[in-house]
Amino acid sequence: MRAVVCRNWGGPRELTVDDAAAAPMIEGGLRIAVAAAGVNFADTVMIEGRYQNKPPLPFSPGMEVAGRVVETAPGVKGFKPGDRVFAKIDYGGYAEEAVAEARFAWQIPKGMDMTTAAGFAVVYGTSHLALTDRAGLKPGETLLVHGAAGGVGLTAVEIGKKLGATVIATAGTPSKLAIAAEHGADHLIDHSAEDVRTRVLELTDGRGADVIYDPVGGAAFAASLRSIAWGGRIIVIGFASGTIPQVPANILLVKHIGVLGFSWGTYRLHRPDLLTGSMETLLGWYAEGALKPRVSMTFELAEARKALEALLGRKSTGKIVLTTGR
C-alpha cells in the first residue's frame, strides 16, 4: 500500500510517500481501506518528535481516518466488511489502509461524505469534552474562543452555542471572523486590530468571560488572563502560535481562576466511556443539523507535505483533509 512515511524527526519536508507494509490486525480491531485522513496540528508535533506519545521510526502520521471496513478481528461485533466508518487511531492514518480499535470507530451517518467524516472525530470530540467534562460550561455563561475559525476553534463556537453559551470569537482577519459568525458566534473580535481585553469587558459589562477556550497559546493566553471573569476557567487546548506560555500563579490566586489542561486522546486510556458517549452525542447533534463541519482544503495523499505546511501557515479554516482516491 502507499503511505506517507516519517523516517527522520523534523518538519513536513522530511516526509516521503512510499510503498509500506500493511499494519497487522489487532485484537478487537478493524482494517479500513482509507478514503480520507484528517490533518491535525498534533501530526506536525508528532513528526518533529515532540508529541507526548512518540512512535518508533519509521511511521506514518495521521490520527483519524474514514473509509470502508475490509476486515474485522475475530469477535468484533457491530461492523462488517463494506461498512462506511470513521475512526480515531494513534498514528498511521496517512496511508491507503489503517487498523483501528472497533470501540473507537463509528458508522458514518447518512448524508456525511468520507472527507467530512475524516475530519470529524478529533476537532468535535476535543471541543465537546473540553467544554462539558473539563470546563463545565453552563447555559448563560460567556465563552471566549481563540482561533475561532480554525479546526478546533470553529467546533468550539458551534458546541458553545449548542450548550447555551454566549460565544465571543477571536481571529486575525475579517474573513476568518465572518466564518466564525456563520457558525454561530455572537460577537467578533479582530485581535490584529482590537484589544481583546477591552472588547471582552465591553461585551460582558465589565465582568469578563466565564470560560476561555485557547488552542493558540502565546499572546492569546496572555489576553485570556486579562479577560477572564472572577472564578472563570481557561482551558488549554494547544499552542498553534508555537509559544508555550508560562502561568503566573499569583494571577490565579487574585482572580480566583482555574487554568485547565486538556488532552482528548488520553480519554481513550482513562475514560473511554466518556469518549464514546461524547461521540454518540455529537453524531446525534449532526443528525439534528446543529453541527456544520467545514473542510476548507483537501490534498491528495502524495501532497501531505503541502497539507501540513498549509496548516502550519494558518492558510486554512476548519479542517484540512488528505484523500487517497479509494
Model-assigned labels for residue ranges:
Residues 118-194:
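Mid-domain Rossmann-like dinucleotide-binding core that forms the NAD(H)/NADP(H) cofactor-binding site
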Residues 33, 45, 56, 84-147, ...:
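NAD(P)H dinucleotide-binding glycine-rich loop of Rossmann-like/cofactor-binding domains
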Residues 22-39, 50-92:
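Glycine-rich beta-strand-centered segment in the early N-terminal region that forms part
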Residues 196-206:
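Short amphipathic alpha-helix with an adjacent loop that forms part of the alpha/beta core around
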Residues 171, 219-291, 316, 323-326:
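Glycine-rich phosphate-binding loop and adjacent beta-alpha segment
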Residues 93-96, 171-179, 244-249:
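Short, glycine/polar-rich helix-capping loops at beta-to-alpha or helix-loop-helix junctions
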Residues 84, 142, 166, 232-233, ...:
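Short glycine-centered segments of the SAM/dcSAM-binding site in methyltransferase folds
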